[in-house]
């Protein structure tokens, strides 16, 4: 028997602990919309990953709930590495340099976005707001601390151990999947659109 922590398939063939990816991106995008942003871009992960697809659904859902148009050309695919965040930001600026906010599907790519904007003299959040996803260690230490979506890693680890012990003690148990909820961590990389120049 196996135990997976991430990217479980829709039909679970093992015990698993997974993040509600859709809710995470929904919270990130809703935060930007509540700050008055409408021209919001997005850098995703690889399209074949279940986590990416869930996050895209959450991104779009936030627009749909408010009856807002979401421009498909402002969704750019990345690969969860820093350099793809840099390249993705360049692509988005080439498509529409008037964007006011960007949701990046992980913090590593957000670091690349920060570097791109720094190289181009674009100030965060005074000119563009940025929201990441994962809340990894260095995100709070960037030159502008990153607003992001936090994953309850310790809870996930504890739940995974709990499921594994129960599986060892009773191999006849049906497969179980525990879905954990992410939360929005607001730092300094987002601001109200009225404050932006």
Residue ranges and their predicted role:
Residues 1-9:
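Short, small-residue-biased leader/transition segments that mark boundaries at the very start
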Residues 11-15, 139-140:
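A short acidic, helix-capping loop that chelates divalent metal ions and anchors anionic groups
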Residues 16-27, 43-88, 103-111, 133-135, ...:
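Hinge/beta->alpha junction and helix N-cap segments in small-molecule ligand-binding domains
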Residues 31, 62, 116:
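Rossmann-fold NAD(P)-dependent oxidoreductase module
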Residues 33-36:
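Non-catalytic positions within long, well-ordered alpha-helices that form the structural scaffold/packing
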Residues 38-39, 70-74, 123-130:
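Short acidic capping loops at alpha-helix termini that bridge into adjacent secondary structure
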Residues 90-91, 95-197:
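Flexible loop/turn connectors
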